[in-house]
Amino acid sequence: MRIGHGYDVHRFAEGDFITLGGVRIAHGFGLLAHSDGDVLLHALSDALLGAAALGDIGKHFPDTDPQFKGADSRVLLRHVVSLIHAKGWKVGNVDNTIVAQAPKMAPHIESMRALIAADLQVELDQVNVKATTTEKLGFVGREEGIAVHSVALLLRA
């Protein structure tokens, strides 16, 4: 078995929605990114790639490559899953922590879990998504951006 950890952060920018875990959430800002800015799926992809010793998303989907401009992070995650499967691994479980002062995540958590489970080709009870704030401390507390920590357990297929 292998364990991987992923971390990503994106700052807020102009826009009226963010995408987290594949779910579009109305918000007063968007997230600045080369792709769709789905910080949750980026951290999760890094955790999966790290567990399989396959590098990180920057190696596989560089932000200098125009083909990934505005890319759907669910498509990128599904590609990561194909890479780990090709190396003889399958997902045991994943645990994700969204760190955000706003918007409120609770109404969207179950939708995120369902989409992630589908993309990982696992059962819903193998995917956890939770959210916390920083009690108004730091860049997250000042509502300048969102961070996510992800942990993935891989098992031999």
Curated annotation (Swiss-Prot):
Its cofactor is a divalent metal cation. Gene3D superfamilies: 2-C-methyl-D-erythritol 2,4-cyclodiphosphate synthase (3.30.1330.50). 4-CDP-2-C-methyl-D-erythritol 2-phosphate binds at residues 8-10, 34-35, 56-58, 61-65, 100-106, 132-135, 139, 142. Its EC number is 4.6.1.12. Pathway: Isoprenoid biosynthesis; isopentenyl diphosphate biosynthesis via DXP pathway; isopentenyl diphosphate from 1-deoxy-D-xylulose 5-phosphate: step 4/6. InterPro entries: MECDP_synthase, MECDP_synthase_CS, MECDP_synthase_sf. Binds 1 divalent metal cation per subunit. It catalyses: 4-CDP-2-C-methyl-D-erythritol 2-phosphate = 2-C-methyl-D-erythritol 2,4-cyclic diphosphate + CMP. The record marks 34, 133 as: Transition state stabilizer. A divalent metal cation binds at residues 8, 10, 42. Involved in the biosynthesis of isopentenyl diphosphate (IPP) and dimethylallyl diphosphate (DMAPP), two major building blocks of isoprenoid compounds. Catalyzes the conversion of 4-diphosphocytidyl-2-C-methyl-D-erythritol 2-phosphate (CDP-ME2P) to 2-C-methyl-D-erythritol 2,4-cyclodiphosphate (ME-CPP) with a corresponding release of cytidine 5-monophosphate (CMP). Homotrimer. This is 2-C-methyl-D-erythritol 2,4-cyclodiphosphate synthase. It comes from Pseudomonas fluorescens (strain Pf0-1). The gene is ispF.
